[in-house]
Amino acid sequence: MSQLRWWVVSQLLLLIVVCILDHSEGARVCPKIVPGLDKLRVGVDITKLDLLPLFDLGDNGFRSAVADYTCDRGQTTVVDGESFDVPDQVDSVVIESSGQQTSSVTTIKSESQISQALSISAGISVDTAKAGFSSSASYAEMQEAITKYGRTVSQMSAVYTTCSANLSPNLLLGQNPLQTLSRLPSDFTADTEGYYDFIKTYGTHYFNKGKLGGMFLFTSETDMSYFQNKNSQQVEANIKATFASILSTETGGSSDQSKEVIEFKESSLITAKFFGGRTNLAADGLTKWQPTIAKLPYFMSGTLSTISSLIADTTKRASMELAVKNYLLKAKVANLDRLTYIRLNSWTVGHNELRDLSAQLQNLKKKTIFSDEDEKLLQSIEDQVSVPAWFSDRTTFCFRSTAVGSADQCNGQSTSTLCAEPNRYTQQYMDKTYLGDTGCRLVWKLSTTESSDWFKSVKVNFRWYPTWSPCACGPVGTPFTISAPANSWTQDYLDVTNPKFGECMLQWMIEVPPTATLWAKNLEFCIDFTCGKKKQCVDANHWTEPYLDISAHEACGMSWALIAK
């Protein structure tokens, strides 16, 4: 009975296709479409989408057409003095001639922020973004820059919009994808390869809205050391100045030779690219390049819809949605496999566990359909090797000093609190206890607004002992240790080191419990002190080398950092 039902359904589908083909034969073909609108009717593989690629070579994620354009209505519009056809399937077209619009600075400090940043221009939801872009060349480049080399990626652009368009909400699948779909069974599990071939040909999504024009894109990968002793406003101002300098240089203008721009360039790997128009004319100036954009526009951004939403057959639509879900999971496996390989070559703790995870990923690579247990396994692997957003975006390491007497001894303030996100040093605390005898009370804290349960057992540890005088910080040679769990300040340490009271040895450690995930066990704690040019990083659960706090006759700059590798 089921075979008979399937035969009847398949014949009906073929009849529908034939009817559509017969109808389309009489449709007026669009002889000259508005430049750039072809991109709105093609499919997109969300896992490989690379709208603004850092490299010219590679797959940009665009696929074959999912809709057919016809021009029965005869609608036209003028672009740069020339008439062009507006397809019936395009709901609205707005021809623009805006001047340069400069974007704000986008900063990507963690892997969790890569998809989020790339999704902004593509106009997709956060849930889809988690699996999106991970197979693109730009994603892989940013991932390596952040996770392998500890760099921060920043982007900024100058945009010249020439056209924006929306597809009709009543868009229908085109002849070719409809024919391909008609040959597929209603059940995804009956022909998984057939459904995957459809996705490989037509993609997972299409743009129902788009913005076209020209763009100059600036991307920098900046060493962590650059951000030391600079606040976010200073960093952003320097990025903007460097962007403006490079845009000026690329378009035949002069270069900014200020020390801020030079310093940023020396600390960064910079990529600058033009999109749209005759890019070979850009070096002759914006006045040469900009007029060529309207007829040679680039698809800069848009809003995505799923191709499955165009499938009229509810059963096949559900099967296509299931196929896309599994296709995205396959991309997630590939991404985690790449990330695990990076971890094996950069982490110092947990190599045996990483090899086990890698073996599990090799088995998952063979899957065509993922079970609920497979999804749980994937999530558990991700939890081990990927630094979560709650840590990279919402966690801080803080230091606070409180003057007991004169504020001159303690950073020049009665109370000073200095905090930094992971992979950033705190701003310098200037230790000047040699200026008095009352000293400064010092405390440290690791804070987060959300976390896994095990993180509550992570501790900040600090210990000290005097070298020759018990007046400085207690009995000579006897170490004192204070510690505090996450979201709590340590007890006060009274710093009265000076030539009168003596010197103290200081050490710090981040203590991570055995129940923690692998990424946390590979955290590093770093110190950078100007006195003695003391700069070092140690793994979690290890003390820093002793630092001799002399506080004799000069101020000592002190900074701390928590590094997620």
From Swiss-Prot:
The keyword Acyltransferase does not apply. Residues 1-26 form the signal peptide. GO terms for cellular component: extracellular region; membrane; other organism cell membrane. InterPro entries: MACPF (IPR020864), MACPF_CS (IPR020863), Perforin-1_pore-forming (IPR052784). GO terms for biological process: defense response to virus. Produced by albumen secretory cells. Found in developing eggs. PROSITE patterns: MACPF_1 (PS00279), MACPF_2 (PS51412). Its main location: secreted. Residues 27-340 form the MACPF domain. Keywords: Disulfide bond, Enterotoxin, Glycoprotein, Hemagglutinin, Lipoprotein, Membrane, Neurotoxin, Secreted, Signal, Storage protein, Target cell membrane, Target membrane, Toxin. One of its GO terms (molecular function) is toxin activity. It is found in: Secreted; Target cell membrane. Glycosylated. Contains four O-linked and one N-linked oligosaccharide bonds. The protein contains 2.5% of carbohydrates (high levels of mannose, galactose, and NAcGlucosamine, and small amounts of NacGalactosamine). PV2 is a very high density lipoprotein (VHDL). It contains 3.75% of lipids. The major lipid classes are free sterols and phospholipids and also have significant quantities of energy-providing triacylglycerides and free fatty acids. The egg defensive protein perivitellin-2 is a pore-forming two-subunit glycoprotein that affects both the nervous and digestive systems of mammals. In addition, it is a source of both structural and energetic molecules during embryonic development. The tachylectin subunit (31 kDa) binds target membranes while the MACPF subunit (67 kDa) disrupts lipid bilayers forming large pores altering the plasma membrance conductance. Both in vivo and in vitro, the protein shows wide pH range stability and is resistant to enzymatic proteolysis from gastrointestinal environments. Perivitellin-2 is a heterooctamer of 4 identical 98 kDa heterodimers, each composed of one 31 kDa and one 67 kDa subunits. The 98 kDa heterodimer subunits are held together by disulfide bridges while the heterodimers are assembled into the native perivitellin-2 octamer by non-covalent forces. This is Perivitellin-2 67 kDa subunit. It comes from Pomacea canaliculata (Golden apple snail). The lineage of its organism: Eukaryota, Metazoa, Spiralia, Lophotrochozoa, Mollusca.
